[in-house]
Curated annotation (Swiss-Prot):
Binding site for NAD(+): D42, A43, E44, Y45, D46, S91, L92, E128, R151, E188, K305, K329
Required cofactor names: Mg(2+); Mn(2+)
Record: residues binding Zn(2+): C423, C426, C441, C447
Any one cellular-component term (Gene Ontology): cytosol
EC number: 6.5.1.2
Organism: Paraburkholderia xenovorans (strain LB400)
Cross-referenced SMART domains: BRCT (SM00292), HhH1 (SM00278), LIGANc (SM00532)
Protein name, entry field: DNA ligase
NCBIfam families hit by this protein: dnlj, PRK07956.1
Gene Ontology biological process terms, A to Z: DNA repair; DNA replication
UniProt lineage: Bacteria, Pseudomonadati, Pseudomonadota, Betaproteobacteria, Burkholderiales
Family designation: Belongs to the NAD-dependent DNA ligase family. LigA subfamily.
Purpose of the protein: DNA ligase that catalyzes the formation of phosphodiester linkages between 5'-phosphoryl and 3'-hydroxyl groups in double-stranded DNA using NAD as a coenzyme and as the energy source for the reaction. It is essential for DNA replication and repair of damaged DNA.
Residue intervals of the BRCT domain: 608-688
């Protein structure tokens, strides 16, 4: 259980303020290290830590042995055996601004006497990435992996040997000839971005709680009491330091240590360099910053270490960190602010997204006033309310997002978000289909927010095939308010088109000719051109074939639409909602007005003959021995069956041939009868 936050003292007396800061930092440490549920952004923690350091510097008598400034935070969680580190796993001091790095380099140079020479001799550093994961120590005895432990409080950690044994990148036996008697390898367990996304996909599919970020996923996976669960989690590891070493001499430099680790078969990250002086340090930092977002894993800074081991020993340690190393952190990617309102915005595909309006906050190198909340379910899951103090995250060019709300700071007048029922842009109904997280505006042909997307889709080759109507022309037509709906395209004249930027007279005439040609189409193409969600070319053809003309489709109930080949509940509901929106019907009437778009009408398809498979749904998958897919389909339909393209609970039979794939697996999962070609023939003959 998380420890209850304590309110800040009413007085500003140093003793009381320091006591509160220690309590708040210890509470945050417990949440971060023990519960794996961090509730304070790094930037806020750093700010409080620096304030406590400042008070203790000014008032040394207030320093107590268990102050967070005197040790690394965290305690061993129950359920794991404690492990005492022979060589403490210390944390690093932090630098944030370029000036901090210049000052660090000067301190090191002064202490080593390099600045006293003329000219000064630049210090040699090993520069590497600061991973956003979980620090661990691996012990090898005579080259065999025997133990893994977390950092814990720096002196005592947790025994996670069985869990770490499941991480494939960690060797269980070291390679090469230079293997020591005892070696403690220090490094970081982390989860790559792609693996994190796949893990959350599995969590969603299993209807289990998703992880907030790769670090939480890595920490939670490593500290599972059941190592079988850890084995299913895609964890990775990078080596970057050393603890105990027995049986051979310590490498002379840090860079040589990492080279030796590679010889032993230990994972070592390639994004590292040996640099000289403050200029070299800052050059490495800014180079990494430029490619940070493209890296396949999360980092929150870089680490500088004096490269030579003898110089490291000369510099020594302070109580909680080495003097020879520094973590240079990127601008905070998370910060606290107040959520003052939640609006919704409509995207070009009609997606209606809640957007948080925030009190301005500087995060990720920019001032942020808006952040995405993704969808209504996310707002509910995170329990985010108007008036909350929230954690906002901004990473590089990624759209800022609200990570969570601080429930202990929730005001009494905080209000829940209510998704509007009508589009704020056009007034059309907002609908959310079953099993979909995104709500959408149903005014696809009318809504200004969706205008460009609707026009682009309408002109596609597989739709009305309006040659010459590309994205740049559509942009101009919309931005100059010349076209509001697809119907307005047929009002365009030569003079209007010829005035468009970079649109010659010949291009204008070609587009007019193409628009004239587009007036003569087919019902299937017209249906597809409307841009109804979930209605592709195949479904458009099935609708045209089944109903024969447009009016019956526009007036069809969901039940009537479900009778169409390959139309399931989600697609049927989407079609029904589209035609139920009056704005869409108005545009359609404008499109098929006299002199506009026409197509040959046809009779509705005859009802399927009553046969041995009347009312049954069959799915074909794989390659049958003697029948082509189309032949088998015709035989089944002739017997009254509906041949569907996907397996669902409504499927009655699956006919599987060679190389049957996911459809066969789904059928077996749902317990649906599976037949081969002979079984299908017997079914058609009424023998099954």
């Amino acid at each position: 259980m998380a420890r209850t936050p304590v309110s800040p003292p009413a007085t500003s007396a140093p003793a009381e303020r320091a006591a509160w800061l220690r309590a708040e930092l210890e509470r945050a440490n417990y949440a971060y290290y023990v519960l794996d549920q961090p509730d304070l952004p790094d930037a806020e923690y750093d700010r409080l830590f620096k304030e406590l350091e400042s008070i203790e510097t000014e008032h040394p008598d207030l320093i107590v042995p268990d102050s967070p400034t005197q040790r690394v935070g965290g305690e061993a969680a129950s359920g794991f055996e404690p492990v005492v580190h022979e060589q403490p796993m210390l944390s690093l001091n932090n630098g944030f601004a370029d000036e901090d790095i210049v000052a660090f380099d000067k301190r090191v140079g002064d202490a080593l006497g390099k600045n006293a020479s003329e000219p000064p001799v630049p210090v040699e550093y090993a520069a590497e990435l600061k991973f956003d994961g979980l620090a661990i120590s691996l012990r090898y005895v005579d080259g065999v992996f025997v133990q893994a432990s977390t950092r814990g409080d720096g002196t005592t950690g947790e025994n996670v040997t069985e869990n770490v044994r499941t991480i494939r990148s960690i060797p269980l036996r070291l390679k090469g000839k230079r293997v020591p008697h005892v070696l403690d390898v220090r490094g970081e367990v982390l989860m790559f971005k792609r693996d994190f996304e796949r893990l959350n996909e599995r969590q969603r599919a299993a209807e289990q709680k998703e992880f907030a970020n790769p670090r939480n996923a890595a920490a939670g996976s490593l500290r599972q009491l059941d190592s079988k669960i850890t084995a299913q989690r895609p964890l990775s590891f990078f080596s970057y330091g050393i603890g105990v070493l027995e049986g051979m001499d310590m490498p002379a430099t840090h860079s040589e240590l990492l080279d030796w680790y590679k010889e032993l078969g230990l994972p070592v990250n390639g994004e590292r360099a040996v640099v000289h002086g403050a200029e070299g340090l800052l050059g490495f930092f800014h180079a990494v910053g430029e490619k940070r977002e493209k890296l396949p894993y999360d980092i929150d800074g870089v680490v500088y270490k004096v490269n030579r081991r003898d110089e490291q020993e000369a510099l020594g340690f302070v109580s909680r960190a080495p003097r020879f190393a520094l973590a240079h952190k990127f601008p905070a990617q998370e910060a606290l602010t107040r959520l003052v309102a939640i609006d919704v915005q409509v995207g070009r595909t009609g997606a209606v997204t809640p957007v948080a309006r925030l009190e301005p906050v500087f995060v990720g190198g920019a001032t942020v006033t808006n952040a995405t909340l993704h969808n209504e379910d996310e707002v509910r899951r995170k329990d985010i309310r108007i008036g909350d103090t929230v954690i906002v995250r901004r990473a590089g060019d990624v759209i800022p997002e609200v990570v969570s709300a601080l429930l202990d700071r929730r005001p009494d007048d905080a209000r829940e978000f209510v998704m509007p029922t009508h589009c704020p842009v056009c007034g059309s109904n907002i609908e959310r289909l079953p099993d979909e997280a995104i709500a959408r505006c149903t005014g696809g042909l009318f809504c200004p927010a969706q205008r460009k997307q609707a026009l682009w889709h309408f002109a596609q080759r597989r739709a009305l095939d309006i040659d010459g109507l590309g994205e740049k022309i559509i942009d101009q037509l919309v931005e100059q308010n010349l076209v509001r709906t697809p119907a307005d395209l047929f009002n365009l004249g030569f003079a209007t088109l010829a005035e468009l930027d970079r649109f010659a007279e010949k291009s204008a005439q070609n587009l007019l000719d193409s628009l004239e040609k587009a007036k003569h189409t087919t019902l299937a193409r017209f249906i597809y051109a409307l841009g109804i969600r979930h209605v592709g070319e195949s479904t458009a053809k099935d609708l045209a074939k089944h109903f024969g003309s447009l009016d019956p489709i526009m007036d069809a109930s969901v039940e009537a639409l479900l009778e169409v080949n390959d139309v399931g509940p989600v697609v049927a509901e989407s079609i029904h909602q589209f035609f139920a929106e009056e704005h869409n019907r108005t545009v359609i009437e404008q499109l098929r007005a006299p002199g506009r778009v026409t197509w040959p009408e046809g009779p509705p398809a005859p009802k399927a003959p009553q046969g041995v498979l009347a009312g049954k749904t069959v799915v074909l998958t794989g390659t049958l021995p003697s029948l082509a897919r189309e032949e088998a389909k015709e035989m089944l339909e002739a017997a009254g069956a509906k041949v569907a393209g996907s397996v669902s609970k409504k499927t009655d039979y699956v006919v599987a041939g060679a190389e049957a794939g996911s459809k066969l697996a789904k059928a077996e999962e749902l317990g649906i009868p599976v037949l081969d070609e002979d079984g299908m023939r017997k079914l058609l003959e009424g023998q099954l």
